[in-house]
């Protein structure tokens, strides 16, 4: 059952190209302003909102006057370069009218899959959210190759949602949800307001993209749903063609909810604790053990020994002085730097390493403390 959007903690909103850009006139300014009002209302209600926005290529086509025919790869990348500037300015103007700051982040799918870049991207987005700014995230179509041809912003939005621990992903599109068959082809198609699990039968209901401006169809949205739901993020597919597309969901306008079976934090920590083989070990003192059990991050001062050859973002096991594993997490340093700062206070790290580094060796959001029974068995 759909909750009110204000009852969610962190929402990622993905916006399709056809919603933002009219082929003849360019940016749909009035629609974007209505979206800005919705985002402002959610932020004022205490909800963190992130936007994954398509539209750079579509907008860049109009800016550069490119022909309506299919674009070559280099033409698409040129259109993206021009469109990203126009798109970022439009979001800044619209949100700025409500006293809200925004920041543009250009990523590719590999940025959410390669662990070191993943940590950097997540830290940047987290900082924007702490500063009450709305991250405007777009696929970096000026340099992407495979992604630019297949249109992965739905999947990218799902990866951003899982990376940031969002509890809801909203895909705004030119269709109002999932039907048993593509409704533009089959007038007898039945609407599905709720999907518990994305099965092969559900996937068979997907069709191709109906709009020429959109690169993704229902199939990519269902792929996004599988990514999101598996990580504990619920997903909504709904039409964004209405003014105030987010408030329309709360008004009861048609939408399909794909419910997640568990909470995002639990899913993320399950992945850390169970699906990754530790690349190294950190032995910590009794004070660090106590801090970790109380929910704190692991600071370098409590680390007594570093074993293994690992890179930043790898999984490491945290051991007590008796050699028992008490926690596991993603480390913010490579092995060489971890050895240099082990045992030192956080305010000494920059001087030791010669660059500004993170205060925590493992942030509490990336750390799973094992239950006492598990630790004894380790």
Swiss-Prot record:
User: In its UniProt entry, what is this protein called?
Assistant: Glutamate 5-kinase
Q: Where does this protein reside within or beyond the cell?
A: Cytoplasm
What HAMAP family is this protein classified in?
Answer: ProB
Which residues are listed for substrate binding in this entry?
A: 54, 141, 153
Keyword list (alphabetical) reads: Amino-acid biosynthesis, ATP-binding, Cytoplasm, Kinase, Nucleotide-binding, Proline biosynthesis, Transferase
The cellular component terms of Gene Ontology attached to this UniProt record, alphabetical and capped at eight, are:
cytosol
Which species is this record about?
Answer: Brucella canis (strain ATCC 23365 / NCTC 10854 / RM-666)
Look up keyword Cytoplasm and say if it applies: yes
Q: Give every PUA domain span.
A: 279-356
- Which Gene Ontology terms describe the biological processes this protein takes part in? L-proline biosynthetic process
Q: Which GO terms describe its molecular function?
A: ATP binding; glutamate 5-kinase activity; RNA binding
Reaction(s) catalysed by this chain, per the record, are: L-glutamate + ATP = L-glutamyl 5-phosphate + ADP
Q: Which gene encodes it?
A: proB
List the EC numbers from the record.
2.7.2.11
């Amino acid at each position: 059952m759909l909750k009110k959007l204000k009852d969610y903690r962190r929402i990622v909103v993905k916006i399709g190209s056809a919603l933002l850009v009219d082929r003849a006139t360019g940016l749909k300014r009035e629609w974007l302003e209505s979206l800005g009002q919705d985002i402002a209302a959610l932020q004022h209600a205490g909800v963190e909102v992130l936007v994954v926005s398509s539209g750079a290529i579509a907008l860049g086509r109009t800016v550069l006057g490119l022909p309506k025919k299919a674009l070559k790869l280099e033409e698409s990348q040129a259109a993206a370069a021009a469109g990203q500037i126009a798109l970022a300015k439009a979001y800044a103007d619209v949100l700025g009218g409500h006293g809200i700051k925004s920041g543009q982040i250009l990523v590719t799918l590999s940025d959410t899959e390669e662990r070191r870049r993943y940590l950097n991207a997540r830290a940047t987005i987290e900082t924007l959210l702490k500063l009450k700014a709305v991250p405007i995230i777009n696929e970096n179509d000026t340099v992407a190759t495979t992604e630019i041809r297949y249109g992965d912003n739905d999947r990218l939005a799902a990866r951003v949602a899982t990376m940031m621990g969002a509890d809801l992903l909203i895909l705004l599109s030119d269709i109002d949800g999932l039907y048993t068959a593509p409704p533009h082809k089959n007038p007898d198609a039945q609407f599905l307001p709720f999907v518990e699990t994305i099965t092969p039968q559900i996937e068979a209901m997907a069709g191709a993209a109906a709009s020429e401006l959109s690169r993704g169809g229902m199939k990519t949205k269902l792929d996004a749903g599988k990514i999101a739901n598996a990580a504990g993020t619920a997903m909504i597919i709904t039409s964004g063609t209405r003014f105030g597309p987010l408030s329309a969901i709360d008004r009861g306008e048609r939408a399909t909810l794909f419910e997640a079976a568990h909470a995002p934090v639990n899913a993320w920590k399950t992945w850390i604790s169970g699906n990754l083989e530790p690349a190294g070990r950190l032995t910590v003192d009794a004070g660090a053990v106590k801090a970790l059990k109380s929910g704190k991050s692991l600071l370098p001062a409590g680390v007594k020994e570093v074993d293994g050859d690992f890179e930043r973002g790898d999984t490491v096991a945290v051991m007590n002085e008796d050699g028992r594993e008490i926690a596991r997490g993603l480390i913010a340093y490579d092995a060489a730097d971890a050895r240099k700062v082990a045992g030192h206070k956080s305010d000494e790290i920059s001087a030791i390493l010669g660059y500004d580094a993170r205060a925590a060796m493992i942030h509490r959001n990336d750390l799973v403390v094992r239950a006492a029974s598990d630790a004894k068995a380790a």
